[in-house]
Amino acid sequence: LRDIAADLGLSEVTVRTRAARLIEDGVLDICGQVDVEKLPGHTLALVAIKLRSPDLVGEGEVFSHLRGVVSVAVLTGRHDLILTVLLNEEFGLLDFYTNEFSKCHDRVSSIETFIVYKGFSLKVPYIL
């Protein structure tokens, strides 16, 4: 925060106070993120889901609690949700579908899976 204060021409105390308020309000989260391409044996999958239910937000919340799910976004278009899923050698795509996604399969009308083979400015929190 010292560097941010210097760049903005503000005191460090001012920046810390503002950052603390943003964190408290849920606007700012300071966390480490990893570049999956630099982690051997890791990959990202994007899982696009068409739901049976019109409760997109409620269903998104359910999917967000599955192991490996980094984030869930509610979409417009032909899919309702897109999940970002972190995978590794011990928890691969088959494990995700067999052990996690299967818990919610009755909520889904169709899915489409995309494997990220190259990302740009793509970093995620390490959750595995």
Predicted features along the sequence, with ranges:
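A compositional/biophysical signature of low hydrophobicity enriched in polar/charged and small residues
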Residues: 1-128
